[in-house]
Curated annotation (Swiss-Prot):
One of its GO terms (molecular function) is precorrin-6A reductase activity. Coiled coil: none annotated. The keyword Oxidoreductase applies. Signal peptide: none annotated. The lineage of its organism: Bacteria, Pseudomonadati, Pseudomonadota, Alphaproteobacteria, Rhodobacterales. This is Precorrin-6A reductase.
């Protein structure tokens, strides 16, 4: 029997959930629980971690999961690695639904860095006005460069004081527009943009805006994840499911 587990949290995951529901697949959608108001899904939904590889192995076995689609954020490396290990142990088929990374276009002023520490080091020594578009989890890393003013864009309001001495938070959920991000960068007199190379259309607006304004971008490259099947499109995922014996209810 086909029973799918979708590891979600991205726009792609939501599109997949709708397609699976429309086609009558038995599936569960899982959120990590890092945002306060996750987008409602048309599938039964669970929120929270699994408890590492052992916990995920237990869940897959207990729930009779036949296929896992990892549609988490490209920077959710630990969850993705856990999924690879757990599926290998249980024999469950695994596919990553992963958007392609962004690639530089004419006019881009990108500096690629491997991690957050390198992103901090790539900022200038002189005080700058930095648009920090990396989410809330790793803001504290930038306290190593306290001379800068940081503009943050967060999905949820911060629960306490920001961990940076000179920072302001804008609360907003994407997708964002090029016009809106251009106006934001211009009105805040931003001099540098720091972002993760998440890929996808929903968050690309800030990079296009930075290009139009001639701003330098420090782009954090994706972390390494163990080898697994990868599909970059919804059609590719549905084809992978068919190739791996997944069928809707009653088929």
């Amino acid at each position: 029997m086909t029973r799918l587990l979708v590891l979600g949290g991205t726009t792609e995951a939501s599109r997949l959930a709708k397609t699976l529901a429309d086609q009558g697949f038995e599936a569960v959608f899982s959120y990590a629980g890092r945002t306060g108001a996750p987008v409602a899904q048309p599938l039964p939904t669970r929120i929270g971690g699994f408890g590492g590889v052992a916990g995920l192995v237990d869940y897959l076995t207990r729930e009779g999961v036949s296929h896992v689609i990892d549609a988490t954020h490209p920077f959710a490396a630990q969850m993705s690695a856990n999924a690879v290990a757990a599926c290998a142990q249980t024999g469950v088929a695994l596919c990553a639904f992963e958007r392609a990374p962004w690639t530089a276009q004419a006019g881009d002023r990108w500096t690629h860095v491997p991690d957050l520490a390198a992103a901090v080091a790539a900022l200038p020594q002189a005080p700058a006005r930095v648009f920090l578009a990396i989410g809330k989890q790793h803001l504290r890393d930038f306290s190593a460069a306290p001379q800068h003013h940081y503009l943050l864009r967060l999905v949820d309001p911060p629960e306490g004081p920001l961990p940076l001495p000179d920072a302001r938070a804008v609360i907003a959920r994407g997708p964002f527009t090029v016009q809106g991000d251009t106006e934001l960068l211009r009105s805040e007199t931003i001099t540098h943009v720091v972002a993760k190379n998440a890929g996808g259309a929903g968050a690309e607006a800030k990079l296009i805006a930075a290009r139009s304004l001639g701003l330098p971008v420090i782009l954090i490259d994706r972390p390494a994840v163990p080898a697994r099947d990868i599909c970059a499109t919804l059609e590719g995922v549905m084809g992978w499911l068919a190739d791996h014996g997944a069928t809707p209810r009653g088929v």
